[in-house]
């Protein structure tokens, strides 16, 4: 599984999908918050979609779909919908060891010279230490291993963990995804890049994420980064 994540091997995940039950897939996705809204302080936030048996029966009819749909779902395609923010929260949960903070646009509110900061609210992502370790190691390999699909997000002096994604689009060119966090051992920052109709995640989105990380660490460390 670690190598499957690192090299983004669809065939490996197809085989996992064949062995999975749709309801288990749905339950774990829901448990980890992927189809839910993040509750960021912006009105009309869109939710995601992870289909289950009831959804397929309603939209395709009972007996009109097969277990073959698991091949698409196993690589996050087909009917699966996630927002960049919900995916970023999921990645933060992996980086933090199984929990993430509810995102906010506003850090603090001032009134008459006083400032009141938002109290962080954390969401648990129930996940075993073994599962977390596998995901973290696989994502580190995506960026740091020579065979990784996200090498373009490397940052000199820091280890980065990430995951590339390429969403097929029936109406045009593929959508390019990349999510990451850094430093690997003591995470401080997480990034999600989505470029619609732009191509492959490793080739297009990962370099942008790497540039964002380089700016972040340069500013933190008092240095500068040249424009690409």
Where are these predicted regions, by residue range?
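Beta-lactam-recognizing serine transpeptidase/beta-lactamase-like catalytic domain environment
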Residues: 1-193
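Short, gly/Ser/Thr-rich active-site loops of penicillin-recognizing serine hydrolases
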Residues: 114-123, 208-228
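Short amphipathic alpha-helical face segments that pack within enzyme cores
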Residues: 83-89, 204-211
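Short beta-strands and strand-coil junctions in structured, solvent-facing domains, enriched
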Residues: 199-200
